[in-house]
């Protein structure tokens, strides 16, 4: 058996998320369906993490085991020929059998895009926020999220994890053209954590909270004290890094 690593991009607009579900089409189901046709038997894929309905990815990482003898790079063309147009395999590489897309990940980067003007052609790819925002206040708020913290206040109550301590290495607000982008690099993220952090920072930007309130929210460990959950369609899984972090 050989282990193949894929880097995959997808437009999550028309999917019920990454993970296979009994109702609704998913990214995992589409890729596994194509691999099953290629292998003539079911093939299970493992991803670096799950993305929700309408969430996008530029650098999702997946692995699977195969008995096919074709060179790893040929999987790119073979898969893309059969996958729908909103899923693209960008790269394929043969790995050692110790590689694991989920458990081997050291850092993940997420980006969240917002626009301050309505645009019907980009409505699925950036959230629209029409009120005035203070970039300086939002940047100060983002700085307070950097470090190792218990992010209970920034995760959903139903999250099935006992340890909610995560490390954020980088958190910044970028301006790119007519969009504002919230960029996070961390050791890992709780369910809905990025969307809740973004929703809260946006509310800092509009004056509902002060940047210093972020520290109090972290200390409270209570979801009710943080801000809203930003909608899913502005969120992108940007990159997954497997190199050891110093």
UniProtKB/Swiss-Prot annotation:
Binding of substrate, residues: 110
Keyword list, A-Z: Isomerase, tRNA processing
Enzyme type, top EC level: isomerase
Annotated EC: 5.4.99.12
Pfam families for the chain: PseudoU_synth_1 (PF01416)
Disulfide topology: none
UniProt-listed InterPro entries: PsdUridine_synth_cat_dom_sf, PsdUridine_synth_TruA, PsdUridine_synth_TruA_a/b_dom, PsdUridine_synth_TruA_C, TruA/RsuA/RluB/E/F_N
Catalytic activity field: uridine(38/39/40) in tRNA = pseudouridine(38/39/40) in tRNA
Listed GO biological process terms: tRNA pseudouridine synthesis
Family the entry assigns: Belongs to the tRNA pseudouridine synthase TruA family.
PANTHER family (UniProt xref): PSEUDOURIDYLATE SYNTHASE, TRNA PSEUDOURIDINE SYNTHASE-LIKE 1
Name of the featured protein: tRNA pseudouridine synthase A
Species of provenance: Exiguobacterium sp. (strain ATCC BAA-1283 / AT1b)
Gene encoding the protein: truA
